[in-house]
């Protein structure tokens, strides 16, 4: 009986230990999927897309990257040939994120300058996507370093975005909750854009639907601008009264 009890105790201890060391799904790195379409079928993503986070510790450039699909079938097809479906998606992300990318030097070698992100030559450098976000580097060697540790180098991009967009951020209220922004708002990065929100809970909501969040941001910014400049009057000027004699 003692042997049986000992075996049961050992089995329970082992099960508990294994339960505590079950592999956890990777945390999302970077931002939520910023495109409106599925990378496999290219159909628009509905209100309830299938959300997957790549679990591949052997490839840090992909591990933790969120992908959104139109269906579970598309998610399964994606796993057969990730590179095939990510290539055009990455190219689209580069095109969309370049205009807002901060005017900073290479994040790996800060002494090396890059072309203006808004210039015609901006797309000809080493532009890579990690965690659904653009990182520009001066050379292929630096690009490889970014792929090996995306979190480290995305943090440098974040600093550049805050320095570039934070000072001129036009809103005083949170686009998610409508609450006034605190003196130190929570920064959310969607692609190369900064969204300031009031609380960490608002930050989570902002990433749930990044396209909708950016649409709200753009609408709020547009509402701050004058509706239209007054058109010059086409009426004839009033006739001046003659001077009294």
Report each predicted region and the residues it spans.
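Bacterial N-terminal signal peptides
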Residues: 7-17
């Amino acid at each position: 009986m003692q042997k049986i009890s000992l075996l049961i105790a050992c089995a329970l201890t082992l099960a508990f230990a294994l339960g505590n060391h079950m592999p956890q799904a990777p945390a999302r790195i970077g931002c939520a999927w910023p495109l409106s379409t599925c990378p496999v079928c290219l159909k628009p993503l509905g209100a309830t897309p299938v959300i997957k986070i790549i679990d591949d510790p052997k490839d840090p450039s992909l591990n933790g990257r969120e992908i959104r699909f139109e269906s579970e079938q598309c998610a399964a097809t994606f796993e057969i040939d990730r590179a095939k479906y990510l290539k055009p998606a990455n190219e689209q992300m580069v095109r969309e994120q370049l205009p807002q990318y901060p005017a900073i030097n290479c994040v790996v070698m800060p002494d090396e300058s890059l072309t203006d992100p808004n210039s015609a030559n901006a797309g000809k450098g080493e532009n890579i996507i990690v965690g659904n976000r653009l990182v520009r580097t001066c050379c292929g060697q630096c690009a490889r370093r970014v792929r090996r540790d995306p979190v480290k180098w995305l943090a440098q991009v974040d600093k550049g975005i805050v320095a570039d967009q934070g000072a001129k951020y036009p809103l005083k209220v949170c686009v998610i909750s409508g609450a006034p922004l605190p003196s130190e708002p929570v920064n959310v990065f969607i692609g190369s854009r900064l969204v300031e929100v009031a609380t960490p809970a608002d930050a989570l909501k902002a990433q749930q639907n990044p396209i909708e969040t950016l649409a709200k941001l753009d609408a709020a910014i547009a509402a701050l601008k004058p509706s239209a400049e007054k058109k010059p009057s086409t009426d004839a000027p009033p006739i001046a009264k003659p001077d009294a004699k």
